[in-house]
Each structure stands twice: as C-alpha cells, then as structure tokens.
UniProtKB/Swiss-Prot annotation:
SUPFAM superfamilies: Scorpion toxin-like. The modification Cysteine amide is found at residue 61. It comes from the Eukaryota. Residues 1-62 form the LCN-type CS-alpha/beta domain. Belongs to the long (4 C-C) scorpion toxin superfamily. Sodium channel inhibitor family. Beta subfamily. GO terms for cellular component: extracellular region. InterPro entries: LCN-type_CS_alpha_beta_dom, Scorpion_toxin-like, Scorpion_toxin-like_sf, Scorpion_toxinL, Scorpion_toxinL/defensin. It comes from Tityus fasciolatus. Disulfide bonds join 11-61, 15-37, 23-42, 27-44. This is Beta-toxin Tf1. It is found in: Secreted. Has the structural arrangement of an alpha-helix connected to antiparallel beta-sheets by disulfide bonds (CS-alpha/beta). GO terms for molecular function: sodium channel inhibitor activity; toxin activity. Expressed by the venom gland.
Length: 64
C-alpha cells in the first residue's frame, strides 16, 4: 500500500519545514518500506494495510 500519511486531524502529514529524512523516518514508524517529501506532504511506499492514508474521497481535513 502507498499514499500520503495523515496527521491526527485527517490532513496530509506536512513536511514543508521538516529536516531531510523526516518522511522516511515517519514512514518507517508506520512499518513502510520507504518514503519521501512529496512537497508539501509525506508520501510512503510499502505500508501495511492497517495504516490509514489520505484519500480524496474520504478527506476530513479541516472539516468538523
């Protein structure tokens, strides 16, 4: 599975002002194989199916 990691509000995990390697570490924490900053958000590869990733159809970012 691949996709954009989400923060606690359902938004894409920002990497806009993060140090180099931030997204790779965040993806590894979620058991992903790799990841990078697809400016301005973290994109991961090889994620297990239990990890929730951002999807346009189910986007809840900024909504209450």
């Amino acid at each position: 599975k691949e996709g954009y990691l989400m923060d606690h509000e359902g938004c894409k995990l920002s990497c806009f002002i993060r140090p180099s390697g931030y997204c790779g570490r965040e993806c590894a924490i979620k058991k992903g194989s790799s990841g990078y900053c697809a400016w301005p958000a973290c994109y991961c590869y090889g994620l297990p199916n239990w990890v929730k990733v951002w999807e346009r159809a189910t986007n809840r970012c900024g909504k209450k």
